[in-house]
Regions:
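Elongated alpha-helical scaffolds
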Residues: 61-75
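Surface-exposed polar/charged interaction patches
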Residues: 39, 46, 50, 69, ...
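Conserved short "hinge" loops at termini or chain/domain junctions
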Residues: 1-62, 121-153
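Short loop/turn elements at secondary-structure junctions
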Residues: 4, 73-153
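Alpha-helix boundary/N-cap detector
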Residues: 24-31, 62, 66, 87-91, ...
């Protein structure tokens, strides 16, 4: 499920328009949105968030903006593949790409995921220490240094 639409990308393109004859076409932009949505869902699933996210509305709005930013960067890169240099569309592409990657990093570290998001309990990695955070594991002699300060050999 894509969080954003063609209209969200078009709003970020300013004077550039999308239709069935442009490069990329609206169908191709829909495919870009699907790719970005898949990337968002993959990151959130790895953190235990149930996807696709449907609530809270503020978080789905955030995801819509983030997905649209990533698709806008890709769309502009397709529209202007040879753009480079100061003052070129390259700076605009970098801006939207920065919005996408920055938001994706915030999702990865969990800082963009609000409380109230439905979490899944299936498939998350676990270990003795994650299941028993207050227990200290007795490592025996393995944790003792082989050479001790002040020891006479």
């Amino acid at each position: 499920m894509a969080y954003a639409t063609n209209a969200d990308v078009s709003a970020r393109l300013g004077t550039f328009t999308l239709d069935g004859t442009t490069q990329p076409t609206t169908t191709e932009v829909d495919a870009l949105l699907g790719e970005k949505s898949g990337q968002l869902d993959a990151v959130m699933s790895s953190l235990g968030v149930t996807t696709p996210v449907t609530a809270p509305a503020s978080f789905t709005d955030y995801l819509r903006g983030l997905e649209a930013a990533g698709a806008t960067a890709d769309t502009l890169a397709i529209m202007f593949p040879d753009a480079s240099g100061p003052g070129s569309i390259d700076e605009t592409i970098a801006y939207w790409l920065g919005m996408w990657t920055g938001g994706l990093e915030m999702l990865k570290d969990g800082s963009a995921i609000p409380s109230g998001v439905t979490l899944s309990t299936a498939g998350l990695p676990s270990s003795y220490l994650t299941n028993n955070p207050d227990a200290e594991l007795d490592l025996g002699d393995i944790a003792e240094p082989a050479i001790k300060k002040g020891a006479v050999y």
